[in-house]
């Protein structure tokens, strides 16, 4: 039943791209929110450095007991609070990616299960309103790999951020920006544009 297999695959492809749209929106917003938090961490680093270098005992503030330790404790709490918020954001992004990755897996599994019933010429044919099945499968898998890599790199970056490593904290905002690939983001946006009419048809 080649026709039935193709219709089922197209239905799963639609679900896959709907999941991709949701993932893209969430990752775009989540990355921007995390960028603000990471920038705040970067701003705390110079304060911690300055506190480490200053001798409060030699300033007019010397009359306040344990001031240096209390200021350090307060700044460290601020770092911990920002890291906790970042961990929450990453957990939310992980859930979104998990849902998208599961849908991509379902699509690929369905395609592989019905390979014998799907004519290769049908899978590679495209029209002005509908990309080919092979193109759409490739786009979904590329997006899946990209978001997985983005999550992994983001987690690795966050693991380097502690109040004891001020250099990593100070350079974190620029490193966070580099986690995203403008080229990959453009490819995902282009893929969603190309499937827009396909998604509206049943």
UniProtKB/Swiss-Prot annotation:
InterPro entries named in the record: CA109-like (IPR029159)
Record-linked PANTHER family: AFG2-INTERACTING RIBOSOME MATURATION FACTOR, SIMILAR TO HYPOTHETICAL PROTEIN FLJ20508
Function per UniProt: Part of the 55LCC heterohexameric ATPase complex which is chromatin-associated and promotes replisome proteostasis to maintain replication fork progression and genome stability. Required for replication fork progression, sister chromatid cohesion, and chromosome stability. The ATPase activity is specifically enhanced by replication fork DNA and is coupled to cysteine protease-dependent cleavage of replisome substrates in response to replication fork damage.
Compartment annotation: Nucleus; Cytoplasm
Record keywords: Cytoplasm, Developmental protein, Nucleus, Ribosome biogenesis
Quaternary state and interactors: Part of the 55LCC heterohexameric ATPase complex. Does not associate with pre-60S ribosomal particles.
Gene inactivation effect: Embryos show defects in branchial arch and ceratohyal development.
Protein's name according to its UniProt entry: AFG2-interacting ribosome maturation factor
Chief localisation class: nucleus
KW Nucleus (keyword) present: yes
Record GO biological process: ribosomal large subunit biogenesis
Cellular-component GO terms for this entry: cytoplasm; nucleus
């Amino acid at each position: 039943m080649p026709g039935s297999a193709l219709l089922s695959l197209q239905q799963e492809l639609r679900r896959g791209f709907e999941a991709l749209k949701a993932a893209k929106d969430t990752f775009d917003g989540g990355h921007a929110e995390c960028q603000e938090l990471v920038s705040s961490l970067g701003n705390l680093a110079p304060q911690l450095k300055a506190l480490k270098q200053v001798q409060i005992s030699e300033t007019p503030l010397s009359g306040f007991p344990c001031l240096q330790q209390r200021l350090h404790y307060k700044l460290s709490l601020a770092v911990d609070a920002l890291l906790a918020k970042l961990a929450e954001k990453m957990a939310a992004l992980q859930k979104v990616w998990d849902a998208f990755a599961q849908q991509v897996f379902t699509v690929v599994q369905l395609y592989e299960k019905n390979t014998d019933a799907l004519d290769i010429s049908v899978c590679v044919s495209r029209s002005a309103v509908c990309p080919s099945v092979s193109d759409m499968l490739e786009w979904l898998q590329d997006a899946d790999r990209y978001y997985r890599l983005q999550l992994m790199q983001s987690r690795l970056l966050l693991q380097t951020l502690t109040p004891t490593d001020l250099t990593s904290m100070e350079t974190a905002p620029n490193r966070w920006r580099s986690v995203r690939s403008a080229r990959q983001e453009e490819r995902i946006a282009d893929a969603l544009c190309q499937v827009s009419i396909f998604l509206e048809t049943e």
